Amino acid sequence: MAGNVKKSSGAGGGSGSGGSGSGGLIGLMKDAFQPHHHHHHHLSPHPPGTVDKKMVEKCWKLMDKVVRLCQNPKLALKNSPPYILDLLPDTYQHLRTILSRYEGKMETLGENEYFRVFMENLMKKTKQTISLFKEGKERMYEENSQPRRNLTKLSLIFSHMLAELKGIFPSGLFQGDTFRITKADAAEFWRKAFGEKTIVPWKSFRQALHEVHPISSGLEAMALKSTIDLTCNDYISVFEFDIFTRLFQPWSSLLRNWNSLAVTHPGYMAFLTYDEVKARLQKFIHKPGSYIFRLSCTRLGQWAIGYVTADGNILQTIPHNKPLFQALIDGFREGFYLFPDGRNQNPDLTGLCEPTPQDHIKVTQEQYELYCEMGSTFQLCKICAENDKDVKIEPCGHLMCTSCLTSWQESEGQGCPFCRCEIKGTEPIVVDPFDPRGSGSLLRQGAEGAPSPNYDDDDDERADDTLFMMKELAGAKVERPPSPFSMAPQASLPPVPPRLDLLPQRVCVPSSASALGTASKAASGSLHKDKPLPVPPTLRDLPPPPPPDRPYSVGAESRPQRRPLPCTPGDCPSRDKLPPVPSSRLGDSWLPRPIPKVPVSAPSSSDPWTGRELTNRHSLPFSLPSQMEPRPDVPRLGSTFSLDTSMSMNSSPLVGPECDHPKIKPSSSANAIYSLAARPLPVPKLPPGEQCEGEEDTEYMTPSSRPLRPLDTSQSSRACDCDQQIDSCTYEAMYNIQSQAPSITESSTFGEGNLAAAHANTGPEESENEDDGYDVPKPPVPAVLARRTLSDISNASSSFGWLSLDGDPTTNVTEGSQVPERPPKPFPRRINSERKAGSCQQGSGPAASAATASPQLSSEIENLMSQGYSYQDIQKALVIAQNNIEMAKNILREFVSISSPAHVAT
């Protein structure tokens, strides 16, 4: 029976697999009267504090037995998540890491409340799995039998347990008492109710939640428990709570959202896997618009929506930066999510769209003065320097504009662009301009980023078949008013790193003018302010396809560094002007941005780029150690993304759901499940996402929550397609040239002519990669570059960095430190480089002709080159200064440092 998993390990009170129902009920009653004491006696025969190495090793033996049973060829397990033959070895490996970290301190580990509960539950679940094989016998080998379904459920539970263990013991060290809940108000609730506890009995949790979000009945409580208790152990951990509050955000209407989306919605599927979603939707293959949704098992805290397209394909996608109800409403309006589980009546979720109170960021006088000195304002997004900040990343609290966040995520950006912390949620914010008269307000003070004490994992996975319970509850459902407990807590804010990279022209902008510009931006940005969560740009006027020589890139491998190739003089806006005030923040998000420079970095094993594929498989930890360090003193990444490309990706139906080639997990005991790299590439004609039917893990690459619209072959989508193709092959061409010639890293003469030629060479790749412009384009020559090893990526990351930073091929990539872990800035920084003037003689189009237009300019250029500046740097400075030679000299002095001592004389 589908509910057996829960009955024996969850709702039944956690009595052993042979425990009686009355024993479990007594245990639950004791919980109710002893809210802060845990009933370990009914979880395991071990008394509290007896988790020792011997018990762990006994558990390992049970896990090994389960693995051997599951390796039976007759079982023919599918190599897709949740894959028990990966999960148990990974769990074993992480437990070994934990034990090694607590070598000699086993008593401390054994007394850890969370670890005790986890080990007891792991022991119980492995025994339960072994019993399943004994009782199921030959039926275990029938793919659609009930015992086999129960095995899939247990696999999901093991998957949740591993994710939770990695979340509470990252790197093997306990951090449950400092775990960051994503949603601020949810974090405040947990802190007030449970302090620094990592795990609490279900009864204690239910009582505390009931005080804030009233639970109407025992039936509702049971259904709620089956949703929150992902590991089915009668406890709620801070990790599980975080997942639940992310899934059913916003907090103010948490249980109302849960009732509407999980209890009464026919499209909700509890504990379903990627393959099971496909199998279920196969019944409605001739009914386009049929859809169901489930919790992603590989990315806890996010939803996965499966749906049938007009041309009979089954796709699955993950919505980003918006609650599920908003994604379902948007998908219904666009014609994708019409028939939940094939039913003709689609629930109306618009009642959930009450405007959520926006977090107001108050600018302090100190910040106001600091930004005025730099010719900027606090509310201006520091990535694009065009739009106002209107979204806060959770849990780290950094601020930016929606356009930049959307572009970053669609371009495979891993984590927060400022600090690389995992993005587990977003909240709309309003930055209130500094008011000298009303500076005493106690609203949240503004800063570049606010590390909030919260962390959110929107993950609610049905711990097992509670279908009957849900149906019963749905029949007696009562609409609940929004909870008054909805105000976000205050949070301390980090210091703002000063922006010393602004040009003199911006520095001298009067603060009043700056404030006026910001006011107009705020007005233009008011489009978002009334939405529950920021949404990506919608289908609007797409930019025309870029010219072939435009060096913006969509290459996935370049994304974690977030450094686009430099603007050519023809398409780069003059940097001595203030960025244009957009008429619409969304509509103008594709405008070219000023391209800055940053220090180049040497290859590093901890380079965030080298870890890209590591983040694709298991949900925790999501970041490498180097990515987790906030490093406020490190210069931010030196450029903006190509937002014109991002806009096209974001708004076009071509940005389909899970549409990336699978990634090979580089290192883990669990290799089999991630060996789908040989899966054939998508046919060019297929919309993106349709090739994603191999496994759920492609969810990680989902660039947009927008589902594919197969019926729409409008001109805008074709324009987007072209935009994506050209940009992706631009990166590929440059990477190929850079990879094939090691000497290029010191003295390449890669100019626009080479770039155009590179485009021509990569033509055949365009159609192959148009469906998913986010994976690394496979170059025709040499083929081995299409799938590089981590060491290849590490070696190439920084060497490609200089290509994408400033287009100066003479930069010596062996100089420089670690990869900057900061987001791009709108203007260039100093860059240390060794330049050979002779290698830069080939001009680049318009700038070259402009620079040589007058004899005076020519002589000045020769003079500057004799001082050690490269020809390309002089070109750029002249473009920025609009051929004002004095201004160009100032720019060169300020932003270009060279090894030649001649530079000192200038």
UniProtKB/Swiss-Prot annotation:
Q: Which pathway?
A: Protein modification; protein ubiquitination
Bias (Gly residues) ranges: 10-21
Q: Which residues carry this modification: Phosphoserine?
A: 439, 452, 483, 619, 642, 668-669, 900
Q: From the UniProt entry, list the residue stretches annotated as the region Sufficient for interaction with EPHB1.
A: 1-357
Acidic residues bias locations? 765-774
Bias kind Pro residues: ranges: 533-550
The UniProt record gives the binding positions of 4-O-phospho-L-tyrosine as 294
* Enzyme type, top EC level: transferase
Recorded hits in CDD domains, A to Z, give: RING-HC_Cbl (cd16708), SH2_Cbl-b_TKB (cd09920), UBA_c-Cbl (cd14393)
Chain ranges of the UBA domain: 856-895
Q: Which UniProt keywords apply?
A: Calcium, Cell membrane, Cell projection, Cytoplasm, Disease variant, Golgi apparatus, Membrane, Metal-binding, Phosphoprotein, Proto-oncogene, Repeat, Transferase, Ubl conjugation, Ubl conjugation pathway, Zinc, Zinc-finger
**Region labeled Required for ubiquitination of SPRED2 — which residues?**
358-906
Q: Where is the composition biased (Polar residues)?
A: 639-653
Ranges for the region named EF-hand-like are 176-248
Q: Does the keyword Nucleotide-binding apply?
A: no
Q: Name a single GO biological process.
A: ubiquitin-dependent endocytosis
> Region 4H: what ranges?
47-175
Q: How does it assemble?
A: Forms homodimers; IFT20 promotes the formation of stable homodimers. Interacts (phosphorylated at Tyr-731) with PIK3R1. Associates with NCK via its SH3 domain. The phosphorylated C-terminus interacts with CD2AP via its second SH3 domain. Binds to UBE2L3. Interacts with adapters SLA, SLA2 and with the phosphorylated C-terminus of SH2B2. Interacts with EGFR, SYK and ZAP70 via the highly conserved Cbl-N region. Also interacts with SORBS1 and INPPL1/SHIP2. Interacts with phosphorylated LAT2. Interacts with CBLB. Interacts with ALK, AXL, BLK, FGR and FGFR2.
Disease listed for this protein: Noonan syndrome-like disorder with or without juvenile myelomonocytic leukemia: A syndrome characterized by a phenotype reminiscent of Noonan syndrome. Clinical features are highly variable, including facial dysmorphism, short neck, developmental delay, hyperextensible joints and thorax abnormalities with widely spaced nipples. The facial features consist of triangular face with hypertelorism, large low-set ears, ptosis, and flat nasal bridge. Some patients manifest cardiac defects. Some have an increased risk for certain malignancies, particularly juvenile myelomonocytic leukemia.
According to UniProt, the name of this protein is E3 ubiquitin-protein ligase CBL
Organism of origin: Homo sapiens (Human)
Could you read off the lineage of the organism from its UniProt record? Eukaryota, Metazoa, Chordata, Craniata, Vertebrata
